[in-house]
Amino acid sequence: MKKGLFIFTIDALVLTGCSSNEGFSGPRDSVADNVKNRFGVTFDPNHDWCTTTSGTVTISGIPAGATNVQLYALISKEVKNDDNETEAETSLLKLNEATNVGSSVNLVYDAPKDHQAIYAAADVNGYRMMRLVKNGVADFSGTKSAAARRRAAVAPDYSSMKLFADSTFESFASQRGWFGEKKQYLYGMSGEAYQKWVQKAEPYSAEYTQLFRDLVFSYFQNKVRNLEKIMESKLVNDKVYPLTTGDAPIVVSPVYKRDQATRWGNEVWNSDLYYYYYKEETLTDYVTKGGNAVDFLNALPKYKAIPFNQHFGSTEDDKIEKRASYTLIYWGDGEPDYNTPGQAFPAGYKIGFMVRAKTTSEAPRKQGELYGDGRLNNKINFWPNFKTSNLGTDGPRACWLNVEDRLFLTFESGTDDDFNDIILEVEGGIDPISFVPEFDRDFYTFCFEDRELGDYDMNDVVIRATRINETTVEYSIVACGAYDQLQVRNVNGATIKDDAEIHALFGVSTNTFINTVKGATSLDPVTDQVTVSKDFSFLNAATQPYIHNVTMGKDIKLSQKGEDPHGIMIPYAFRWPKEKTCIKDAYLRFNEWGQNSRINSTDWYKYPVEENVY
């Protein structure tokens, strides 16, 4: 998903000193006095002002057919949850990428110092396999494919499974008259039958469990409205239905729920998973004869697959575990027969899923049928409690997602639109579905003060940089809060040349502040891509961009150990201070970091003061 230039994302900017016609090239004691007056503290004399680390990863055992290989950094930020408790919000950032690789490759990376982990990834046959980097090494050897797991699956005995009349209910939608005179019924087996039907599942390894958490919740972040990402997958509405193959059981395993059970009335624990199915040609024939597809789908029998209160603990929350599986049963077409045992699914059926929310808290405001196919949610999405999700007409309640070659269905069962309330693994006899989540590249921001006696708003020149792949780096000049004539050197691009004056590149005069004054006209960045060596690093001083102040005849480079912070390279989507605002007032933890970079507020740049940043 594309991010706006000045929205807080995980990228990096280069901050430079404030620009104005004040200041001069004075002696170092004058500079030191100015720094102390501006910041009000004494900085660590051994501070190197570095927020970044670098390394090389050896990736081996790359599967045949891999189209590219990437490196990702896992980063986190502290946020407050609904109970005002601190928890970590994670993100994955792409660091480097290589194509046309063989069975092994070495990739160089730069990453924020405070990263939690580095992952190597290989794209193979529409899936993204990932390995945690340990001691600079990632090995893909010995990967067990979904096909191998599928061959190992054992078909259950369907012959004793029958529908139970006392487990037939009129849907909430039908009770509310949403289908007019028509009635909609939900069918299921007895509670005892489900207890017999459940099978013990092979648990995930500790490493896969960690990968699941890191990937899923970096993409579907908690309490973040993720509908846009759902729609980008294109696996919504009529595309949300997997197609049965008839050659293996279809197995569904609940692996996660998060509903703050004790606070909100055990929402998931009180709910059930249902499914329904049809043949595409039957639906097509119905529509061809003048029928409506939504009416057809609503009229299909809905069968209970999993009573969540038999699987999850009543207060279980935010726990990833695959411990039990339920095989979907084919009950025939048309009106259900209570006396006919179930069968394995034949080929050629499309399967849809629905969660029947029936929490006892605030009922019936929080009760209703929630469909993966958004076309069936045009009433429930406007029902008293559910309407606060803002999913609107046709808003889906579920999305497919791959973690490696395993397939998961992620449900939004409540109102916060984060699509991580219930997560189910679906495997076996269905055609492959591929949706690999994409993550933003890591960015670095170079921020410079253009004069020695600066105001340290660190926006005199701001450069955003990102590594596109092994041999390509992109630089963008995104802001210039200075009146001096300035040049960006050491980029050596087609546009950002050593002798190119920054204001001229934006087509404005030198008495113009560029993207540093709130409410002023925003100008598009000036961007260049340059070719670099495979061992390139943003930490290499020989290849780092720096500023030449033509007016003062001075070069401004990134700050070194013991110097004042006149040039800093910052990771993530850093938002630079607005004009004439010292960085300590835009980021209240900056001074703590400046006094002891090894201990204090090493992630200060994640917490801006909104009114003081651009």
Model-derived regions, located:
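Extracellular distal adhesion/interaction modules in secreted or cell-surface proteins
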Residues: N21-Y614
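Sec-dependent N-terminal signal peptides
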Residues: G4-L13
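C-terminal motif of bacterial Sec signal peptides marking the signal peptidase cleavage site
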Residues: L15-G17
